[in-house]
C-alpha cells in the first residue's frame, strides 16, 4: 500500500494493490486500478467509517476447513470478510453497511473470464450476507481507476483506454501465478 498526499485536493491518499484493503474514519482517499479484479467500497453512512478491498480471485478452492484458511489478501471470500470485520472493529454497524462494486472487466480476452467469476462471487457474497448494493460499475472490457472517499461515500471512476490493458493484464497474470506459490497463512474470522 502506498501513502501519499494529493496536492490538488490536499488529501491523504492510500493506493491499494491486488490483495490489499484499507479502512479509515478520516477524511482520506483510497484508490486503485482494476482490470478483472473487483473492489468493494463499503461504508457505514452514519459513522463515516469506510474501506476498500481489491481482490483477484473469488475463492480459495484449496481451502477445506478452518486449518487451511488462506492469506486474507488473496481471495475474495477472505478479502470481503476481512474488510467487513475491519469496518466493524472501527465502529461501523453491520446493518448499515453499504456496498459499491467496481471492476470485473474482461481485459484478458484469451483467458478464462476471471472478471465474470469475481462479479458472481461478489453478488453472491453480498446477498447471502444480507448487505445492500447502492452502486456499481462492473463488467465490460475496460480497466478502471477508482477514487473512493469513505467519509462522504463518493466514488470517482475513470474507464481507462485499451492501451492500458496489456500492462494491466501482464500484472494480473503475474499475480495469479504467484498466488499458488505462497504458503497458506493468515487468520480470518468468518461470521
From Swiss-Prot:
InterPro entries: CheD-like_sf (IPR038592), Chemorcpt_Glu_NH3ase_CheD (IPR005659), Cytotoxic_necrot_fac-like_cat (IPR011324). One of its GO terms (biological process) is chemotaxis. It comes from the Bacteria. Signal peptide: none annotated. Keywords: Chemotaxis, Hydrolase. Gene3D superfamilies: 3.30.1330.200. Probably deamidates glutamine residues to glutamate on methyl-accepting chemotaxis receptors (MCPs), playing an important role in chemotaxis. Belongs to the CheD family. This is Probable chemoreceptor glutamine deamidase CheD. The lineage of its organism: Bacteria, Pseudomonadati, Pseudomonadota, Gammaproteobacteria, Thiotrichales.
